């Protein structure tokens, strides 16, 4: 029977595997490995229903406890967290399911506290539970094991922003070390903006031009207004084509030019921006994980600005200034590490929300 199951698994015939296991084993005598496999098959089968997903979570939980913190326990725990994350907001029992994950996670801590995989899955668990202190603790554990890198440095900064318990001095000192990891890409030399030109090209770079993201409510009218002036507007999306949606399409038509770079390398993005001869490049994502902010460690355009998506300094030397006002930057200005241009009234331009979000 095991050989048959193996062949079915290779053929990805998950429904057949479920039938085979249930026909030849009972809940009582079924070993942890088969419970875990049942969970994987229920979660992976085509046409999976909410009921299938809940059964899969139950199988992972059973496998975890039957294996008594062996390797299968770790596999089942990770699968449980992964499936909870996949279900997302569609699943009404999301929080309850994640609380089960957390219970198992804490029970496994003594055995797996130094295991990188265990720690990594803790990041996802505490992200969805909105337990930011616990998530920061896990990030620091990984950094302690592997050293600081771009991904975990970004996660640490982003999570820390939710807590707001870093002083600006602490933040900028960390960012100085973090920014040393960013590469400098090949770029042609550029000259200053010719203000006398008939058209000045301004580009907005973002990973958030989709899903009714709040960014879109701040820039829609701005883009419309810029089109009435001497500015030529370029939208540069860091998403992949398949990630775009109706929100993207509505935003796309507002720009004079639209470029998708989600599948490009950092060097390719730099090359594209320079070929467009952009005069002013505005980053809308800052240090959030999907933003590709590291390309701003390279001088691509005469003027490079950070605004809106990340309300703090990026600490990168090739960003000329951040846009703010007297309300967003009040104290510790000397610790921002980037010049601050303060608008006289307010730093953003909200367009209003018609629908509840």
Where are the model-predicted features located?
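Alpha-helical solenoid repeat scaffolds of the TPR/TPR-like class and their adjacent stem/linker regions
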Residues: 1-357
């Amino acid at each position: 029977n095991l050989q048959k199951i193996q062949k079915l698994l290779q053929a990805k015939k998950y429904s057949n595997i479920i039938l085979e296991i249930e026909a030849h084993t009972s809940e009582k005598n079924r070993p942890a490995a088969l419970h875990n496999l049942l969970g994987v098959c229920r979660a992976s089968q085509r046409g999976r229903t909410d009921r299938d997903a809940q059964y899969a979570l139950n199988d992972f939980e059973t496998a975890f406890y039957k294996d008594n913190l062996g390797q299968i326990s770790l596999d089942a725990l990770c699968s449980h967290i992964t499936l909870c994350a996949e279900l997302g907001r569609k699943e009404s029992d999301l929080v309850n399911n994640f609380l089960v994950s957390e219970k198992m996670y804490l029970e496994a801590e003594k055995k797996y506290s130094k295991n990188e995989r265990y720690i990594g899955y803790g990041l996802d668990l505490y992200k969805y539970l909105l337990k930011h202190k616990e998530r920061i603790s896990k990030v620091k554990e990984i950094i302690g094991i592997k050293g600081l890198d771009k991904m975990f440095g970004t996660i640490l900064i982003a999570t820390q922003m939710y807590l707001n318990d870093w002083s600006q001095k602490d933040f900028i000192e960390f960012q100085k070390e973090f920014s040393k990891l960013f590469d400098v890409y090949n770029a042609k030399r550029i000259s200053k903006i010719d203000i006398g030109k008939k058209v000045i090209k301004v580009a907005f770079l973002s990973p958030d031009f989709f899903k009714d993201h709040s960014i879109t409510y701040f820039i829609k009218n701005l883009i419309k207004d810029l089109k009435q002036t001497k500015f030529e507007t370029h939208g540069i999306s860091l998403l992949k084509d398949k990630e775009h949606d109706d929100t993207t399409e509505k935003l796309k038509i507002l720009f004079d030019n639209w470029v998708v770079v989600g599948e490009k390398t950092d060097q390719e993005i730099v090359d594209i921006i320079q070929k467009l001869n952009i005069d002013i490049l505005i980053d809308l994502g800052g240090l959030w994980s999907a933003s590709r902010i590291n390309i701003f460690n390279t001088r691509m355009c005469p003027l490079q600005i950070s605004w809106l998506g990340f309300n703090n300094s990026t600490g990168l030397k090739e960003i000329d200034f951040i846009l703010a006002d007297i309300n967003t930057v009040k104290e510790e200005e000397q610790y921002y590490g980037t010049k601050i241009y303060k608008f006289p009234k307010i730093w953003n331009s909200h367009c209003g929300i018609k629908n509840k979000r």
